Amino acid sequence: MNRIAADVQRAFENAGEKTLPIKVEEIVLGKQAADSLLDYVKRKNNQHIVLVCDANTHRIAGIDLENRLNQEGFQAECLIIPENEAGDVTADERSLIHVLIHTKQPTDVMIAVGSGTIHDIVRFAAFQRDLPFISYPTAPSVDGFTSAGAPIILYGTKTTIQTKAPSALFADLDLLKAAPQSMVAAGFGDMLGKITSLADWEISRHLAGEPYSPAGAKIVQEALAACIEHTEDIAMKTETGIRVLMESLLVSGLVMLALDHSRPASGGEHHISHWIEMELMEKKRPQILHGAKVGCAAVLLTDTYRKLAQDDGLNEFSPSRREAIQSAYQTLPRGEVLADWLRSAGGPAYFDEIGVGQDSVKNAFRHAHTLRDRCTGLRIINENKTLINHGLYE
C-alpha cells in the first residue's frame, strides 16, 4: 500500500476504529507520474486501455498519455466525451451512456484523464462494466479522486451512487501546477467546505444518531488545517502548495472510501452546491466549478450556523439538542474569514461573484436539504418554524 493510503488506514487502526479496507493499490503524487502509470499497467498486463477525456483534458494530457501507451505496445484509445448544449461535460445520463456504448470490447482498464466530472463518469461506467479504472487527475480541484461515490445527475436530480474507487492514482505535479488558477482555487474551496461539513457531521451524530468516526473527523480536520496553513503557497501554485492541496484532497477522499460515506466531507454546503448545479442544468446555463460553489456556500453557512447557535428559537429544543447545536456551530470562523482565504487563493467568495443571483441562493437555501436524508444545520433551520420565524433565512 502507498504512503498516503497507509497513513489514513493506520490512523483508523490506532484509534481502534474498524473501517473498510482501502484498496487503492498505488498512489503516486510527484513528477513524471505518467512513467509510474506505464509501469503499473505493465505489471497488471492491461493490454486494451480506454482513456476517457473531455476536449480540454485530451489536449493537455490525453494525447500524450495515449501515444506513450501505444509506443509501449498497448492498445490504447482516447474516448472524448462531447459537450452538451451549454458547452459543458456533465456527469448525466447522456455522458454515462456515451461512455458505456463507446467503450469497446475487449477493454482491460479505463483511465480517467481529467478532474471531478470525468472521474464521476468513469467510476460509474467502470463499475457498470466491472472494470478497474485508474485515476490520472489534471487539476487539484476536487476531493473525489480516491472515493467510491459518484455524484451524477439522474432525471435532473443530483444523486450520489456508491460505485468503486480507482485501483491506482497517478498525479503529476507539473501537470497539476499548470492547471488554471480557478481550478486550484476550486480545490481549495472544496477543502474549506470541510469547515461546515465537519460541524454538520457532529450535529448528525448527536441529533440523528448517524454514523460518526472521531478518527475520520480528525484526519479530515488535519488535512483542512494543512491547506489553510499553506494558503499562500496554494495561491502561488508553488510545488509545496500544490502538493499539500492535492494530498489533502486525496486524504479526504480516502476517508470517505474507508467509511463508505461522504459525511466528513459533504454537508449543507455541498447540498447547496448540488441544488444550484441542478438549476443551472435546467436553465441550460454553463456550469460553475464545484469547489467554487462549495466555497461560496461555506461562507454563507458559517455565518448562518453561528446565528443558529445564538438564536433564542433554540429554547424550543431539549437541553441536550440545544447544547449539541451550540457546541458544533458557535466556534465556527466568521464568513468573512473564509472569504479572505478563498480570495487569497484566487477564488470567489460570494455567489454573486459567480453569477448566481439572490433568488437562486434563497431557493437553494430553502430546498437543498431535501437532496440527501442527512441531518445538517441547513435541515434543522428549514424543518423548524421557530427558527425560520427568527429570521435565519435572511
Swiss-Prot record:
<protein>
    <recommendedName>
        <fullName>Glycerol-1-phosphate dehydrogenase [NAD(P)+]</fullName>
        <ecNumber>1.1.1.261</ecNumber>
    </recommendedName>
</protein>
<feature type="binding site">
    <location>
        <position position="190"/>
    </location>
    <ligand>
        <name>Ni(2+)</name>
    </ligand>
</feature>
<dbReference type="GO" id="GO:0003856">
    <property type="term" value="F:3-dehydroquinate synthase activity"/>
</dbReference>
<feature type="binding site">
    <location>
        <position position="54"/>
    </location>
    <ligand>
        <name>NAD(+)</name>
    </ligand>
</feature>
<feature type="binding site">
    <location>
        <position position="190"/>
    </location>
    <ligand>
        <name>substrate</name>
    </ligand>
</feature>
<keyword id="KW-0560">Oxidoreductase</keyword>
<dbReference type="GO" id="GO:0006650">
    <property type="term" value="P:glycerophospholipid metabolic process"/>
</dbReference>
<keyword id="KW-0479">Metal-binding</keyword>
<keyword id="KW-0594">Phospholipid biosynthesis</keyword>
<comment type="subunit">
    <text>Homodimer.</text>
</comment>
<dbReference type="InterPro" id="IPR032837">
    <property type="entry name" value="G1PDH"/>
</dbReference>
<dbReference type="GO" id="GO:0008654">
    <property type="term" value="P:phospholipid biosynthetic process"/>
</dbReference>
<feature type="binding site">
    <location>
        <position position="274"/>
    </location>
    <ligand>
        <name>substrate</name>
    </ligand>
</feature>
<feature type="binding site">
    <location>
        <position position="147"/>
    </location>
    <ligand>
        <name>NAD(+)</name>
    </ligand>
</feature>
<feature type="binding site">
    <location>
        <position position="270"/>
    </location>
    <ligand>
        <name>Ni(2+)</name>
    </ligand>
</feature>
<feature type="binding site">
    <location>
        <position position="290"/>
    </location>
    <ligand>
        <name>Ni(2+)</name>
    </ligand>
</feature>
<comment type="similarity">
    <text>Belongs to the glycerol-1-phosphate dehydrogenase family.</text>
</comment>
<dbReference type="InterPro" id="IPR050071">
    <property type="entry name" value="Dehydroquinate_synthase"/>
</dbReference>
<feature type="binding site">
    <location>
        <begin position="138"/>
        <end position="141"/>
    </location>
    <ligand>
        <name>NAD(+)</name>
    </ligand>
</feature>
<comment type="function">
    <text>Catalyzes the NAD(P)H-dependent reduction of dihydroxyacetonephosphate (DHAP or glycerone phosphate) to glycerol 1-phosphate (G1P). The G1P thus generated is probably used for the synthesis of phosphoglycerolipids in Gram-positive bacterial species. Prefers NADH over NADPH as coenzyme. Is also able to catalyze the reverse reaction, i.e. the NAD(+)-dependent oxidation of G1P but not of G3P. Does not possess glycerol dehydrogenase activity.</text>
</comment>
<keyword id="KW-0444">Lipid biosynthesis</keyword>
<keyword id="KW-0443">Lipid metabolism</keyword>
<dbReference type="GO" id="GO:0106357">
    <property type="term" value="F:glycerol-1-phosphate dehydrogenase (NAD+) activity"/>
</dbReference>
<dbReference type="InterPro" id="IPR023003">
    <property type="entry name" value="G1P_dehydrogenase_bac"/>
</dbReference>
<dbReference type="GO" id="GO:0046872">
    <property type="term" value="F:metal ion binding"/>
</dbReference>
<dbReference type="Pfam" id="PF13685">
    <property type="entry name" value="Fe-ADH_2"/>
</dbReference>
<keyword id="KW-0963">Cytoplasm</keyword>
<dbReference type="GO" id="GO:0106358">
    <property type="term" value="F:glycerol-1-phosphate dehydrogenase (NADP+) activity"/>
</dbReference>
<dbReference type="GO" id="GO:0005737">
    <property type="term" value="C:cytoplasm"/>
</dbReference>
<keyword id="KW-0521">NADP</keyword>
<keyword id="KW-1208">Phospholipid metabolism</keyword>
<feature type="binding site">
    <location>
        <position position="143"/>
    </location>
    <ligand>
        <name>substrate</name>
    </ligand>
</feature>
<keyword id="KW-0533">Nickel</keyword>
<keyword id="KW-0520">NAD</keyword>
<feature type="binding site">
    <location>
        <begin position="116"/>
        <end position="120"/>
    </location>
    <ligand>
        <name>NAD(+)</name>
    </ligand>
</feature>
